[in-house]
């Protein structure tokens, strides 16, 4: 492990020597070769899918693991979008001149070596590698063993392009150890690794956060809420709620709990019930919800703490926006929260008082995504407050240094 990381660290200096045009060219070649190697990648993915079915993995995990030609094309297109982004390295973030004539510039630079730990989504391999490369960082990728074959096929494609361009393949590396011990070693290698970004289940995030000596930016669980206020447009509210839950239930920006204002519960809950029925969504409600919808399941305290990642929804009736905010404060994960209302004052209160990376008015939480935000892609959605928060694009994979230009000044 140490020898592997030492080689990765040594390769970082190569990225400092190439300009934005070269990085763009390499990434466009990677995108082309991902499409050219589609058959190889899909064959590898089919091996992973067969093993996943044998292991009876959840439908959410299998959905994230699955690749088809459309998803492979989407991976390639994501790399192209990253290639076309403005180079985040070398930006002058601030600058000033002191009274003694010293000129100071605050300039963006790469972080260095970034370890990314993730589970069953093969597209993270290409996205993370491309984002790190574009931002001048070496990437150490630790995917889940359930996606081993897919990740290896994608990484081999990327490394072949690097070598064709006389760049070390170690700029993008898969951690060779897929075990828990491999993660344990990686997160303690602060001599070689500058940042760890874990994305996955709650257990993984907690383990990494509690045991790492390398700095960590967490991609924690997405226990997302939508609150339907008494001043909501009902048609808008129903459409947003259904989209937030059922469009893709297995992702971190899907809604897990729906909060409904007591003042409108009788009418809106019936509309919501009819809207969710065609999607076969399992609804679980509090006592007040069950007064209106007696046939649904009862929501337990544990349900309100649960990120289902399935087509299951908890519903709670609350006494206005104050209680909605309090509920989110208690159960939310700091990811994405939404309010549906036509009342500007209520909307602003919610936006200002809810503590989350992304807070929405009259829109689905499903929009929390680096690609949607215009970042090209994301390496994760940070629920940290430092050093990055929300969808992490290439600018969030940089730090800065101060460059000071003098003409012989000495300090008196």
Swiss-Prot record:
- Does the UniProt entry include the keyword Amino-acid biosynthesis? yes
Q: Biological process GO annotation list?
A: L-proline biosynthetic process
Q: Which GO terms describe its cellular component?
A: cytoplasm
- Pathway(s) served: Amino-acid biosynthesis; L-proline biosynthesis; L-glutamate 5-semialdehyde from L-glutamate: step 2/2
Q: Which reaction does it catalyse?
A: L-glutamate 5-semialdehyde + phosphate + NADP(+) = L-glutamyl 5-phosphate + NADPH + H(+)
* EC number of this enzyme: 1.2.1.41
What enzyme class is recorded for this protein? Answer: oxidoreductase
The protein's predominant localisation is cytoplasm
**Which is an annotated GO molecular function term of this record?**
glutamate-5-semialdehyde dehydrogenase activity
Asked if the Swiss-Prot or TrEMBL record annotates the protein with the keyword Metal-binding, the reply is no
Q: Sorted alphabetically, which keywords does the UniProt record give?
A: Amino-acid biosynthesis, Cytoplasm, NADP, Oxidoreductase, Proline biosynthesis
Q: Where in the cell is it found?
A: Cytoplasm
Q: Which family does it belong to?
A: Belongs to the gamma-glutamyl phosphate reductase family.
This chain's function reads: Catalyzes the NADPH-dependent reduction of L-glutamate 5-phosphate into L-glutamate 5-semialdehyde and phosphate. The product spontaneously undergoes cyclization to form 1-pyrroline-5-carboxylate.
Question: Record's PANTHER family?
Answer: DELTA-1-PYRROLINE-5-CARBOXYLATE SYNTHASE, GLUTAMATE SEMIALDEHYDE DEHYDROGENASE
NCBIfam families assigned: PRK00197.1 (NF001221), proA (TIGR00407)
Name recorded for this polypeptide = Gamma-glutamyl phosphate reductase
